[in-house]
């Protein structure tokens, strides 16, 4: 089994400190595991956590405010619920959400992920969404994208974004980390693209990011993993 496969199937720090594994993995192999774990657990607010992990997220932009909790029975998928206050349609509702990891590729210095995401309103099953979310990152560089096709009883729409960024410095695991990003997003309800700078900070299990544009105003995201 390769290091990549090993990490993908065992994203658990307890594996690293287990003595039997320690004596069977060469020093460079241990370094690779730490590096991939650092990328996997730290840089990006992932829609799937480690096996048995939970994540609480809050989002706010010009379209909606939402609070989203998800639980990951395995590293391959997560299930959750999202409470939404939609500013555009002036309505409150919830989604039952399911996210599945379609593909993950680990190298010595990077990780690539591709996810399927979906949600359904249990009170109005005709209101739902499907989409894709992906990212590629190293400790220095990040790129990501997202796309949603939303079915709504009032009006259907799509929401999409791309994001690129870099870390101005490389901290150690557990340090405060900073990312400087550029994000461009488009919502078919509003038309046109909105591009703006984003700052992201994370330390341990806590992450916050925010950006601002005159057209879309504040775009904020807070996450805590436990």
Language-model segments: which ranges?
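Membrane-helix boundary connector in multi-pass membrane proteins
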Residues: 188-192
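Transmembrane beta-barrel domains of bacterial outer-membrane proteins
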Residues: 46-182, 194, 198-226
């Amino acid at each position: 089994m390769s290091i990549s496969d090993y990490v993908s199937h065992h994203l658990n720090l307890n594996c690293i400190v287990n003595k039997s594994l320690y004596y069977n993995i060469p020093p460079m192999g241990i370094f690779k595991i730490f590096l991939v774990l650092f990328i996997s657990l730290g840089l990006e607010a992932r829609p799937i956590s480690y096996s048995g992990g939970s994540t609480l997220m809050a989002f706010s932009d010009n379209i909606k405010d939402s609070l989203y909790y998800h639980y990951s029975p395995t590293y391959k998928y997560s299930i959750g619920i999202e409470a939404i206050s939609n500013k555009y349609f002036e309505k409150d509702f919830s989604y039952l959400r399911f996210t599945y990891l379609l593909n993950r590729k680990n190298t010595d210095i990077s990780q690539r992920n591709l996810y399927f995401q979906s949600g359904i309103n249990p009170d109005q099953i005709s209101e739902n969404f499907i989409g894709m979310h992906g990212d590629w990152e190293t400790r220095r560089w990040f790129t990501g994208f997202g796309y949603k096709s939303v079915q709504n009883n009032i009006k259907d729409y799509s929401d999409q974004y791309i994001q690129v960024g870099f870390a101005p410095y490389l901290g150690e695991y557990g340090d405060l980390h900073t990312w400087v990003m550029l994000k461009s997003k488009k919502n078919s309800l509003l038309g046109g693209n909105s591009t703006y700078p984003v700052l992201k900070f994370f330390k341990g299990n806590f992450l916050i990011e925010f950006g601002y544009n005159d057209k879309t105003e504040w775009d904020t995201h807070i996450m805590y993993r436990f």
